[in-house]
């Protein structure tokens, strides 16, 4: 991390189909080796699946899923007097979004459906309902923070 000045955040352009910045960020996060068209096909395919199977607005399902998966607190290691403590800290808004997207991606990858679009559609639908692998990860992080609440006075 640079110590001189704060590095400016890059502006992410909204995606062409839905005009949503979060969808564009998720596509960029899903993209491998610069293959954006493949990432677009996966995300839009997942959105079509949500539309046909659930009959709900895919953009709404996506935003609800993201908001459900966002963590509020996490633990950070802090060394105090020769012992490492897991100190619960609040998560910055930008990191919340990044973690939620990362967890959704990883949970979708672990699913057993045939195509990535189907996996992502299933994971987004489940996360919007408060279930699924990404929600399990968020609950695990929250549980760790709750268990280590006694060390919250070791602030950073």
Swiss-Prot record:
Record carries keyword Cell wall biogenesis/degradation: no
One Pfam match: Ribosomal_S7
Record's keyword annotation contains RNA-binding: yes
GO MF annotations in UniProt: rRNA binding; structural constituent of ribosome; tRNA binding
Entry's Gene Ontology cellular component terms: small ribosomal subunit
Signal peptide (UniProt feature, chain positions): none
SUPFAM superfamilies on file: Ribosomal protein S7
InterPro entries, per the entry: Ribosomal_uS7 (IPR000235), Ribosomal_uS7_bac/org-type (IPR005717), Ribosomal_uS7_CS (IPR020606), Ribosomal_uS7_dom (IPR023798), Ribosomal_uS7_dom_sf (IPR036823)
CDD domains to which the protein is assigned, alphabetical: uS7_Bacteria
Domain of life the protein comes from: Bacteria
Alphabetical keyword list: Ribonucleoprotein, Ribosomal protein, RNA-binding, rRNA-binding, tRNA-binding
Role played: One of the primary rRNA binding proteins, it binds directly to 16S rRNA where it nucleates assembly of the head domain of the 30S subunit. Is located at the subunit interface close to the decoding center, probably blocks exit of the E-site tRNA.
Oligomer and partners: Part of the 30S ribosomal subunit. Contacts proteins S9 and S11.
NCBIfam families: rpsG_bact (TIGR01029)
Family in the record: Belongs to the universal ribosomal protein uS7 family.
Designated name of the protein: Small ribosomal subunit protein uS7
Origin species: Burkholderia multivorans (strain ATCC 17616 / 249)
Organism lineage string: Bacteria, Pseudomonadati, Pseudomonadota, Betaproteobacteria, Burkholderiales
